[in-house]
Amino acid sequence: MAVQKAAHLRAIETADPLGGPVPPAPMMPPGYRWHDDGPMPGLWLDPHPTEEGEKAMRLAGLFKVAAETRDAEGTGWGLLLQWRDPAGRQHEWAMPKAMLAGRKATVWEMLSDGGLFIAASEKARNRLADFLNLCRPNARAIAVDRTGWHDGLFVMPGRAYGANQTELAVYQGAPLPKGLMASRGTLEGWQQEIAAKADGNPRLALCLAAAFVGPIMELADAEGGGLHLRGDTSGGKTTCLKAAASVWGAHSAWVQTWRMTANGVESTAAQHSETLLCLDELRELAPRDAVTVPYMLAHGRAKGRQRAEGGLRRQAQWRVFFLSTGELGLADLAAQAGDKPAGGTDVRMIDIAADAGSGRGVWEALHAQPNPRAFADALNDAIGRNYGTAAPAFLERLAADKDGAREMIRASIDRWTAANVPADASAMVQRAGKRFALVAAAGDLARALGVLSWREGWAERAIAKLFKEWCEARGGLGAPEDERAMDAVRGFLATHGDARFEGLEATEQKPVHNRAGWWRHCQPEGARREWLLTAPAWREIAREAGLPTERVAKAAIAAGWLIPGRDRAAQSVALASFPKQR
């Protein structure tokens, strides 16, 4: 029987979602045919001539094998499948062929979940698997296992953005959450009802600008990381997170929780690479993972794993910018497990107070609403009606002139940094400043491309205000290690000053257990004390700070708390009846 092409299938071909030329029909393996006569259209298998008494078998509904896919290294082969569900909605899935070797049930589940009929019998499903293995479409496509930039194209499920596209590019990664690519309303509606409400509200402006950071990270040569809004539950943090999510799609799909394990980070990061990852309520992350999970997200690389046949699997990579909320900060959560974030963690995941200090939670301007609750309710209502339109417009315009955007981004970052980050700030503050500058540049670019309807300069001013608040909250422009060292010294003396130290001028000696040192009055005032610490006591302070003894000494000398010796190390003091102490 001749191959029959269903009108249903022709509709898919004439409206190719990839936007490129329609590929020729695939070469059909012997015995298989498309059939659209009667009530059971789809893929059928005719019985072999030697199988007397056998009937033709329906394997699946109508679908199209649009292209054969593989990654840039020539591995990860698969098929780009397209079909329409019973309601007429088009679906597309880049199926890895490796799934046919051991996870066929997942293949049938994915296709059935998208509304494609799949025969129930094991025999029929095995013949369908044979078809998918044997089918050789004429078109080829590059398949990627993460969203984002690939050879000049920005690849999202169902669409690749970029000019002069010579080859199809498709997403062939882990299945995405339902609704992730959904949209509702218009860009103009989103601008008027959501983006405009960020005027006068720096924290909302920060979150909306941050939603555009992902696609420009490569252009700015920026490392991964994120921002964390910390504060009370009723302050409006989650509403800001939902507003940011509305740039890309429905908040129900884009806003996730921190309730994940270190093993789940890789697929989540790959699904949100160079887009936006929204994570609500930090306290849902297990304290034992408080250090490793944020680090992995920012670091951009998966753990190396061994193949069963020997050698390492290809290491998954991503570039993620994430927004987070929670009542606790990362250091607070890590402390519950007796851990401390590694140096630089507070720059990879910048902690920002959610409370704006105006008595209105995160809000400062209510835009004619009577109170903060009414403003948040109106904004949440708007978020439910307007989403998923801003990111496609941004990507389309960004990809059309990627080189021009790169120049604008870098100039914006340099300008903002020069205006807001002091040259004598610590390296840690300067790194944080670059993170804030990146967010400001993203907001500025989105405005220039006509996606954010803000007045000129608002993104830069709003982000500058929050950077200044962040610097003040951390105690200045110094390194956080200095603050930890000083806190440890201050806490040690406050706790043990009377019990473990002996006064050198005391007329009456008393036993000192677990001695930490001595004290004496300073000259000429005599009202202040000078503390002489033993080497073991200094090591105890360093352990509390989580720093080397030399690093604590350096911080104490810089603060004027420790009198240095000739080599800028701690000064040695000789006491009668005691060995020399440092």
Predicted regions and their residues:
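Extended alpha-helical interface modules used as scaffolds for assembling large macromolecular complexes
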Residues: V3-G78, R84-A94, A98-T166, A269-L276, ...
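Alpha-helix N-cap/helix-initiation motif
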Residues: K197-A205, R230-T233, S267-T268, R283, ...
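Solvent-exposed alpha-helices and their adjacent loops that cap or buttress functional pockets
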Residues: D221, A269-Q271, R314-A316
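Short coil/turn connectors at secondary-structure junctions
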Residues: E223-G225, S273-E274, W318-R319
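AAA+/P-loop NTPase substrate/partner-engagement loops
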Residues: H228, T238-A290
